[in-house]
Amino acid sequence: MTQSRLHAAQNALAKLHEHRGNTFYPHFHLAPPAGWMNDPNGLIWFNDRYHAFYQHHPMSEHWGPMHWGHATSDDMIHWQHEPIALAPGDDNDKDGCFSGSAVDDNGVLSLIYTGHVWLDGAGNDDAIREVQCLATSRDGIHFEKQGVILTPPEGIMHFRDPKVWREADTWWMVVGAKDPGNTGQILLYRGSSLREWTFDRVLAHADAGESYMWECPDFFSLGDQHYLMFSPQGMNAEGYSYRNRFQSGVIPGMWSPGRLFAQSGHFTELDNGHDFYAPQSFLAKDGRRIVIGWMDMWESPMPSKRQGWAGCMTLARELSESNGKLLQRPVHEAESLRQQHQSVSPRTISNKYVLQENAQAVEIQLQWALKNSDAEHYGLQLGTGMRLYIDNQSERLVLWRYYPHENLDGYRSIPLPQRDTLALRIFIDTSSVEVFINDGEAVMSSRIYPQPEERELSLYASHGVAVLQHGALWLLG
């Protein structure tokens, strides 16, 4: 029965792929062959390949019964699609194989995922059953379901997105949950095997009324600290912060097995753009801590649906720590995308300076002299619908998009650093922009939807001059 469901899903995906439109389909970001994609799942290095699984609906460009899509890569940049790994339909995952993680259990690729069942009609979140399940594979492609390995505590329905790792000769698992008082929390379990688990403690929880669910947890050490990474739902916007439908971020602290997680800071968003959710981390083959997120947002219009697909992932980002601050940089493998190079000489800009007439897939590096630039606004623009600019009056870096025909507009912004220069590394794809600020001190990621004739890339300044100290551009392929 499982194989017939996988076969039906693969056939449906193939039919959808035949009619997929490519106006917004990315050149160098992982996206589904067709259909729907959301959370990254099961990121792992296994059998000399990187594996990225993801939440996938192969029958439609809309969210639906969740399958696990699958892609592999040699370098985390160039991805090859593989057969669908998991399809829902068993008693414990009848309505969805929800998010989870992957581990190498003595040469067996093991997927730990949430089995989801609607108890009172699809979409009624007040009546669900969620359990943690296991599926295994020796070749990394074909998986056998092993059934339920963990059920929720009494009184908890929302219980999902297991992240598993091994430490101190013990398996550990964090699971996102909503407690009976409608407050988000992360539960910690320990296991002698992937099939036998014991509750350890509530690792962290929201304050009353702060958020009603904590999804997609991850827990890892980096530098001198541990980081709890998760996606809270129900946070209220505060000024420039928490403006998206849902957030994703980290809480730093200290932890060792058997002890409390001693938090040393507050929740901080990982990405300050419009579109970033459900990040998951893993270790590269050389031990680097890498994170990939879903570069979309719930309840966003997603114009690519008209062309038979929706959703894509961010570039793989290397995490590091400096002076207690978490940094995110594109993995160095991203440089393999570079093709034609174009230098951008230092200059003073007072109007518009065109870099590319038709920028499809580019990387741009810019270093602005903040102290010597007096323009009210200055920065980079793509067509008339996307601007990344310094606002001298508010002293903020602003990522603005304006696609009224797609019902998409608005901006996200962060404070300018208290220094003389601002260094930006920007990746523009067919329908996305990712901005790495000051060597990874901050990141802003957003989906953009310019029409083919709206891809002129230029620098600009208004009401004054802007001083560019350094610039470079590469066409990517």
Identify the meaning behind each predicted range.
Residues 10-16, 249-477:
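Beta-rich accessory regions
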Residues 1-161, 166-211, 221-272, 293-344, ...:
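Beta-rich carbohydrate-recognition and catalytic domains
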Residues 215-217, 279:
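Repeated scaffold domains used in trafficking and secretory/extracellular systems
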